UniProtKB/Swiss-Prot annotation:
Pfam families: Pro_isomerase. Belongs to the cyclophilin-type PPIase family. PPIase H subfamily. It catalyses: [protein]-peptidylproline (omega=180) = [protein]-peptidylproline (omega=0). This is Peptidyl-prolyl cis-trans isomerase H. GO terms for biological process: protein folding. Keywords: Isomerase, Nucleus, Rotamase. Its main location: nucleus. It comes from Cryptococcus neoformans var. neoformans serotype D (strain JEC21 / ATCC MYA-565) (Filobasidiella neoformans).
Length: 179
């Protein structure tokens, strides 16, 4: 058993993204959330996947959000449904919330981690690693992992990019939710 496997008898939440690149469906990414290691961070992400957190009866979350930053051999970043450009922040706890912990390390591809602009600035933005990124340990909270659909992550990683590592084709979360 690795350090990121769940305790015996514990079932972690599984969420998904259906991805489109341009106007073409690209596949599904299924992610396991570490609610036993990072409960607050995992719950924020889960609710933004399901849209169950609402403001004035309007679901808040990742449906129709984009991946706005792609760096091959590093990560794909998305989730800014506020502004769409990497400057927006929102969480179910308010605009931002604190770093929960740094127990899980950025040891390889397929790890789900919070994007931030410094200590205790977590919101809606996240990234999925496509390679080891140990230099992020202690700065970004890993709260889940891809359990199916790493090929879809690789498709995102290979979209041509322009200025600011922005994909030249729109990479969109067409649908999302909890399994």
């Amino acid at each position: 058993m690795s350090s990121i496997d769940p305790p015996a008898g514990h079932t972690r939440p599984i969420v998904f993204f259906d991805i489109s690149i341009g106007d073409t469906p690209a596949g599904r990414i299924k992610m396991e959330l570490f609610d036993d290691i990072t409960p607050k961070t995992a719950e924020n992400f889960r609710q933004l996947c399901t849209g169950e957190h609402r403001i004035n009866s309007v679901p808040q979350g990742y449906k129709k959000a984009t991946f706005h930053r792609v760096i091959p051999q590093f990560m794909v970043q998305g989730g800014d449904f506020v502004r769409g450009d990497g400057t927006g922040s929102f969480s179910i706890y308010g605009a931002q919330f604190e770093d929960e912990n740094f127990k899980v390390k950025h040891t390889g591809p397929g790890l789900l981690s919070m994007a931030n602009s410094g200590p205790n600035t977590n919101g809606c933005q996240f990234f999925i690693t496509t390679a080891p990124a140990e230099f992020l340990d202690g700065k970004h909270c890993v709260f889940g992992r891809v359990i199916d659909g790493l090929l879809t992550v690789r498709k995102i990683e290979n979209v041509p990019t322009g200025a600011n590592n922005r994909p030249k084709l729109q990479v969109r979360i067409a649908e999302c939710g909890e399994m």
